């Protein structure tokens, strides 16, 4: 027993030393002039990735790991920077982090990042198109400025974006929370099979949010129209400006809370199989088993609100 404990302790100590050594000095350094690179393609198996800004004219890559032979491969071909994991090696005990420093305000044509079991952190990035996916790992981004399309997905891990500006946004996680600070876009589609969706500020023409199991909370909404749905979870939407086109909210099992600006002109069509509608604007409280339609002020775009089992609240 003592021998087993000693062996386990020795293994943990060895891994700890390896961790410390992996973080101290890079095992590989590469640099490229910024005009050499128009695209970035990164594909990692287990290495973590950090992308940071630098105030120079070079793109710098540093690799920190506890086994030089297993370090990812770095190369530049046809104006594309490639960083990729080596294949067919044992990942147990292997610790690695790739740091990429990009010149401030450099815009790329396309950035594609894939991680199997990798945490990915991005401070600032400018690109025409952007694709980011992890199978098992967290995604954290501070500022993304994407001219066209942005796709951000994770199979099992959280997605946390402070600010993103893009034309079309698609974000999805199978199991994990999705959080956005500020979104500025034309259209956004955000889905989670099992996890909450939180957005602090949304500006765009249209958004669609859906979660199978988890709450949806969106604040400071400025949009023309939207679709929101949840199978099992509460939906709370807080509008900065009222909608201008038909929109829909639907949940199978969960409350719906809607907050609109005072004196807004719009219509609602509300129904609930088992629940109460609290209309705090007109002071009504009812159980709308069939569709209940109400016009506010001059009337306007219709917001359809449906729940199978849950209360509905509307207030300004």
Segments predicted by a language model, with ranges:
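Intrinsically disordered, low-complexity terminal regions
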Residues: 1-316
